[in-house]
C-alpha cells in the first residue's frame, strides 16, 4: 500500500496532540492569532444565527376540479409576463394569477382573465405570503397545456407543483419572512399496483 501511494516506509503520520500541533498552538497563543480566530468564529456564528424557524402547513383553497401551478420567480414583472404567456399559449384561457413581492411594499400583485379565479389566487397567495412565490389557477384547461411555456418565462425559477389535487404547502417562517420548502400534492400511496391494475 505504501509503495502504491508512494509513501516512504519510515513515514509516521502525526497524531492528535503531537509535538508539532502543540508547537503550532503555542505559536498561535503567543502572537494572539488563536484567540483572534476563536473570536471571529464566535462572531460569525452569532451573525448567522437567524433565530427561530417555524414550519407551517398552508392548505390551498380551490374547487376540486380546478388546476393550479405553484412556483417561484424573481421579479415583479412575473405577473405581466406570465399573463402574456397564458393568453398567447391558450386563446380564451380562463385563469387567475397572484404573486408575492419580497421587497419594497411586499404586496400581493395579481392579474388574470376571470375575476373569481383572480380573487381566489390572490387569497391563496396572501395566505402563503412566501416571497417571490406565485400561484396560477386555471379553468377548463390543464397544466400540461401551458407548463413548458410558464417554465420558459425568464422570471420563473422553479415549479413546486402543477395539479388538480388537494395541495398543502409547507412554509418555513423566520423573523425575516416566509419561504416554501415543499408541497404535499394529493394523498399518500395506498399500495403497489398488481397485474389487475395495469
Summary of predicted features, one role per range:
Residues 99-135:
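Aromatic-anchored, charged helix-turn/loop surface patch used as a conserved interaction hotspot
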Residues 67, 124-130, 141-198:
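Helix-rich interaction surfaces within compact, conserved domain-sized segments
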